Amino acid sequence: ENSSESVFELQCASTAALPASDKIGSQFCEVQGVRGSGQWDLGWGWHMGTELMGEAFEPGDPRKDATLLYFRRSDTDPITPENTNKPYGESPVSQADGTYFNKKAYTNPALREEFTRHGFWVNIRIIRYGDVVLMAAESANELGKTGEASNYLEMVRARARGNNPDILPKVTSLDQTVLRDAIRHERRVELGLESGRFYDLVRWGIASQVLHAAGKTGYQPKNALLPLPQDEIDKSKGVLVQNPDY
């Protein structure tokens, strides 16, 4: 928390007197935590990764294990940071709906003993360095500065690659369309389950296409904008007009 790469994050805390307070803490982890019983009762299990999300990661990308949590809900398995992914196998926790829990909302077991299992002490990261670098890549590419965009993209991929030259090869094309697709892909995996994907899809104008292809047919073009509160429209005395189709 509050690392050198944190641009803006909401500060949260738990205390002995207020271990689970939404006044000094947040429900960020509780809402997304592993939903189970006993020691696996870590939250509500919302905002889960899909099979499509899992398939988006390139072979060997370490960000997959840092994003998607593979759990075998068993009260006989101890919880440690080391046994929350690969030892459980790479398959969804629920074969029925093909979803994965969000590892970025997985809390420190030692702190659970002190402050409850639901992670009210975890800060909420709003903007981080990787996001900003990919913003720069996207902006440069849309301005036709493809060489600059490629360099920004490689900064993110190189960091994820680490010392393993066999994964995440450099994107060498300077074609604007190819780079656009590569940058959009990189945002999906670098920022996976950090709550920005929907807004990216809307911003790119492809929300209907992508969501409908994933079976989320409830999304309609009007949902790109939120409805204006009627009270505010009334107070504006005709200045504000309701967004289309609301």
State what each model feature region is.
Residues E1-H47, G119-I126, R157, P169-Y246:
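Long, intrinsically disordered, low-complexity segments
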Residues E5, F57-Y129:
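Flexible, polar/acidic helix-loop-strand segments at domain edges
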